[in-house]
Each structure stands twice: as structure tokens, then as C-alpha cells.
Amino acid sequence: KFLDIAELSLFNNSLAGINLHGDRFFYVNPLEADGVRRFNHGNGGRAKWFGCACCPPNISRLILQVPGYMYAYSKDRVYLTLYGGSQTTIPLEGTRVKLEQTSAYPFDGKVRLTVQPEKGSKFSVCMRIPTWHDPTNLCREDFIPNKQPKQAEVELSVNGQKTDFKMEKGFAVIKRDWKPGDVVELNIPMPVRFVDCI
């Protein structure tokens, strides 16, 4: 649940908050501005930089920290918590595992993960399945993290072969003997949906 909220905030608030030139930013939520009432600073658009700004530098700092939030691990599990092109090496019990992730996410729901353990090892790769893939489940307090996605909603394969997975706390878990060069492919359909800001 918290990773879903972090992802929604990152894409819809933080990254959208600064313009492409980095010299204007939102102090109000433009999704809720109605053009009639003046919110916060009375500006429904991006404001110019001013003398003592604290929010814009914090957004810049957050963007630099994102790679540290993309992966987590335990002694025999690797977790992909956020998706995007990246590389990391994870120390698991008995081996180190290099991971290379390629994806155009969030513009495309296809994620390709190359798994390179130093030696063949048995461990779990856990890939987060965002709750937004099910519009009835989006960031609800009572969402069901272990709900098995419908096959039409999420596709998961290893080395080109469709694979079974178990849902645990919002993650698709694949436990197997991994060899250097194994490739996991995740496809989450991403139809455009209207989400109201409340």
C-alpha cells in the first residue's frame, strides 16, 4: 500500500511539480484548482522561484534518492519496488546478484529484468504489482494486497515462458533456481483512466 502511494505521489505530484527548466514549481494541487477559488498562494499555475524556497530543493533531493527506493532485499529475496531503467547488485545469502532493469515505465507497463547471480542459486524475485492495475482497488484503505491479478491484467514470464507466481503483500513472487542471464518480463496493461483528486 505504501509503495503504491509513494509511486502515485512521485509521478503525479513530485515530478509534475517542477517545470522542465527547473525554475517554476507548483505550491498548490492543480488537479483540484477550479479556476474560481484561489488556493494557498492564489496561483493555479507554477510559481516563479523566490528568495527562500524550501519545497523545490526538497523535490530535487527526492529525485536523486529515487534509485535507493527501487530495490529491497532480505536473505533470500529480491524486491523490485519501483520500476524504471536501472542497475544494482544485491548481496543475498550465498551469492551476489546483479540486476538490470529496462523499462519505459510509467509510459509503458513492460518491465524486463535480467538476473545475473554470481553462481546459480535458489531465491525469490518479488515484483510489485501496483494496485492501480485494478481500478476498484486504487489506494483504498481496505485494498487486498494478496489478491491474485486476472491473467488478462498482468503477464509474467521467465526466459520467454509464461510462469506461475504467488501474490504476497502486493508482490508477484517467483521462487526458483536462477542462472546467470535469466530474464524476467512483466507486462502490466496501462489503459488511461480518469482519477479524481479528493
Task: Show the residue positions of the predicted features.
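A surface-exposed beta-strand-loop module
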Residues: 155-183, 189-198
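Short polybasic amphipathic segments
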Residues: 88-90, 153-156
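Aromatic (Trp/Tyr) and acidic
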Residues: 1-139, 167
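Functionally constrained cores in energy, signaling, and assembly domains
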Residues: 2, 13-14, 61, 67, ...
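Intrinsically disordered, low-complexity coil segments
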Residues: 44, 146-152, 159-160
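Glycine/proline-rich low-complexity spacer/linker segments in large multi-domain proteins
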Residues: 137-149, 188-198
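Short loop/turn segments at connectors of secondary-structure elements within structured domains
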Residues: 121-123, 150, 180
